[in-house]
C-alpha cells in the first residue's frame, strides 16, 4: 500500500489553486484570439491581459512603472540583468554568492562576452544574509548593475534590499552620477511575504507565478518609472517592445488570479500561520533527530522555508527514504538536487560535503498534521539510515 503523499517542496513549485485553473480554462476558451489582432477577439484577449497586469501590479503595491510579462522567473531575471547591462556605460556588476543561477550565470555571461568585471559578495556564514555594507564597499563609478535577491530560495533568508537601495542612492549623490541599476529577484518572495515596489527601492523586480499557486511558464519583470532595459530579442515587439512573442493569455490570466489570491492570504495573516508551522516543524525535527541543526540562524527569514542540516548523513539516500514514506522535500533546492555535493549557496555558508541539508518548504495549504507527519517520517528515515 502506497503511503499518503505529503508535498513539502513548495519553494520548488506549488500546486495551482483551483480558482487559478478555472480562470485559465475560461480564458483559453473565451479569449483565444491574439491580443495584437484588431478585431473583437483580439480586444477581448487584450482586456484579459491588462486586467491580469493590473492585478499583479496591485499585489506589488504599485500602479506606476511597467510590468512586462515573460515566460517565467528565469527570463525575468535575464531581462533585468542583461537588459540593464546592455544600456549601461559602466562595465562593473555586483551580485551575491547566493543568487539563483538565473542571475549568476547571466552575470558570468556578461563577464565572458562583454568584458564586465564581477564583484561577488559572500553572505555572513552564520546568518546567510549579505550585508548591505559589503555591497556598498564594492561600489565604483563604473558600477552598472547591482543584483540581489529578496529571499534566498535554499535558505529562506531575507536580504537587505531596501538598505542596499539607500546605499546606492547615497553613493550616487556623493559621486554626482546616475545610480547603478538595482535588480531584485523576488521570485521566492512575491505572494509569500509583503513585497512593495515603492519601499524596496529597486529598478527592476523579477516575479514568477508558479511559486504562489499559479501556473508554470509565466513570470514578469516590473520596471520602476524611468528605469530602462534592452529587449533580449526582437520580433513583434509585444509587451511595451521589451518581450516579443504572442502573449500566453491563459497563463497570464492565471498569474493575475494567483496574485489576487496571494494578496488576500497576506491580508488574512497567512504568513504568521505558516511561520508558526515552520517553527513547529523545526522544533520537532531538532528534538527527534540527534545532531540536526538549522543551516543558518539569526537572520530575517521568509515564513515558508525551513533549511536543516544533518551532519554525517547522505542527502540523496535521506531524500529517497523520505519519499518512500510519502514525504517530498528537496536537498538544498530542486535546482541543485541533481548535482553531487552541496550547492553554491550551501558552500557559501560553510556546508561541507559530509552534511546533508534538507529544505522543507510550506504553503498556505500546509497544516499542523502535515508537520507532525513530516517529523515522524524524518525520524524514521534517519533511524533507517543510521542502522
Regions found by a protein language model. Give the residues of each.
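Pyridoxal 5′-phosphate
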Residues: 1-387
Amino acid at each position: 500500500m502506497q503511503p499518503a503523499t505529503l508535498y513539502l517542496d513548495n519553494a520548488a513549485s506549488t500546486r495551482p489553486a483551483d480558482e487559478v485553473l478555472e480562470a485559465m480554462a475560461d480564458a483559453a476558451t473565451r479569449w483565444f484570439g491574439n491580443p495584437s489582432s484588431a478585431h473583437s477577439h483580439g480586444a477581448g484577449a487584450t482586456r484579459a491581459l491588462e486586467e491580469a497586469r493590473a492585478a499583479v501590479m496591485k499585489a506589488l503595491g504599485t500602479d506606476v512603472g511597467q510590468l512586462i510579462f515573460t515566460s517565467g522567473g528565469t527570463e525575468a531575471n535575464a531581462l533585468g540583468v542583461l537588459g540593464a547591462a546592455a544600456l549601461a556605460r559602466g562595465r562593473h556588476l555586483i551580485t551575491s554568492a547566493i543568487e539563483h543561477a538565473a542571475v549568476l550565470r547571466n552575470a558570468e555571461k556578461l563577464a565572458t562576452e562583454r568584458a564586465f568585471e564581477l564583484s561577488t559578495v559572500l553572505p555572513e556564514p552564520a546568518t546567510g544574509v549579505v550585508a548591505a555594507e559589503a555591497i556598498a564597499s564594492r561600489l565604483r563609478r563604473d558600477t552598472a548593475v547591482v543584483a540581489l535577491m529578496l529571499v534566498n530560495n535554499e535558505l529562506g533568508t531575507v536580504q537587505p534590499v531596501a538598505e542596499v537601495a539607500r546605499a546606492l542612492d547615497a553613493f550616487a549623490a556623493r559621486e554626482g552620477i546616475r545610480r547603478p541599476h538595482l535588480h531584485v529577484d523576488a521570485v521566492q518572495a512575491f505572494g509569500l511575504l509583503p513585497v512593495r515596489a515603492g519601499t524596496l527601492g529597486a529598478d527592476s523586480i523579477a516575479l514568477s507565478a508558479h511559486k504562489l499557486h499559479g501556473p508554470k511558464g509565466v513570470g514578469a519583470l516590473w520596471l520602476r518609472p524611468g528605469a530602462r532595459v534592452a529587449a533580449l530579442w526582437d520580433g513583434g515587439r509585444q509587451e511595451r517592445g521589451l518581450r516579443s512573442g504572442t502573449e500566453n493569455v491563459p497563463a497570464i490570466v492565471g498569474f493575475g488570479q494567483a496574485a489576487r489570491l496571494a494578496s488576500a492570504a497576506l491580508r488574512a495573516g497567512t504568513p504568521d500561520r505558516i511561520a508558526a508551522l515552520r517553527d513547529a516543524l523545526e522544533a520537532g525535527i531538532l528534538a527527534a533527530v540527534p545532531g540536526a541543526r538549522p543551516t543558518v540562524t539569526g537572520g530575517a527569514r521568509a515564513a515558508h522555508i525551513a533549511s536543516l542540516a544533518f551532519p554525517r548523513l547522505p542527502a540523496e539516500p535521506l531524500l529517497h527514504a523520505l519519499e518512500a514514506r510519502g514525504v517530498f522535500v528537496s536537498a538544498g533546492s530542486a535546482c541543485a538536487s541533481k548535482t553531487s555535493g552541496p550547492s553554491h549557496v550551501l558552500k557559501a555558508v560553510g556546508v561541507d560535503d559530509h552534511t546533508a541539508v534538507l529544505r522543507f518548504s510550506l504553503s498556505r495549504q500546509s497544516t499542523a498534521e502535515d508537520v507532525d507527519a513530516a517529523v515522524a517520517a524524518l525520524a524514521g528515515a534517519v533511524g533507517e539510515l543510521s542502522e
